[in-house]
Structures are given as C-alpha cells and as structure tokens.
UniProtKB/Swiss-Prot annotation:
Residues 21-26 form a propeptide. Keywords: Disulfide bond, Secreted, Signal, Toxin. This is U8-lycotoxin-Ls1m. Coiled coil: none annotated. The lineage of its organism: Eukaryota, Metazoa, Ecdysozoa, Arthropoda, Chelicerata. Contains 4 disulfide bonds. InterPro entries: Spider_toxin_CSTX_knottin (IPR019553). One of its GO terms (molecular function) is toxin activity. It holds the Pfam family Toxin_35. Residues 1-20 form the signal peptide. Expressed by the venom gland. Belongs to the neurotoxin 19 (CSTX) family. 08 (U8-Lctx) subfamily. It comes from the Eukaryota.
C-alpha cells in the first residue's frame, strides 16, 4: 500500500514538472506574424521589426512583425 502511494506521488510530481516545462517553452513566431507585445518570440532566423504609424505628423501607434534578418523593406507606390 505504501509503495502504491509513493509511486502515485512520484508520478504526480513528474507530470507537474513536465507541465511546468511545457508552459515555459513558448513556440516561436513564424515570419510575418505580429510581435508587438512579444518582441523576443520570433524564430531564430527572424527579427522583430517595428514601424511607427503616423497621422498628420503625430505617431498614433506602432506595428511590429517577425521579418527576415538583414532584409530591407521599402514602400511601393
């Protein structure tokens, strides 16, 4: 009986440890996903690049996206 209780407690502890590790390992954000509130979560080959939004010369917001490192994006007219 004591062995069953001990085994149950050990299994419970192992399951809790695995759940805690899974919560800490957040999946990375793929290319073009919004990273405004999570700038460090882009996948390793990407960088969180932010752009300001302006209206009448005043900044009204900011957008951030996971983009390829070293790539320059230009606006097309």
């Amino acid at each position: 009986m004591k062995l069953m209780i001990f085994t149950g407690l050990v299994l419970f502890a192992i399951v809790r440890l695995i759940e805690a590790q899974a919560e800490n390992e957040k999946p990375c954000l793929p290319e073009y996903k919004v990273c405004t509130h999570a700038p460090g979560n882009c996948c390793s080959d990407l960088v969180c690049d932010c752009y300001g939004r302006y209206k009448s010369g005043a900044q009204i917001g900011r957008n951030c996206f996971c983009l390829q490192k070293g790539v320059i994006y230009k606006r097309e007219n």
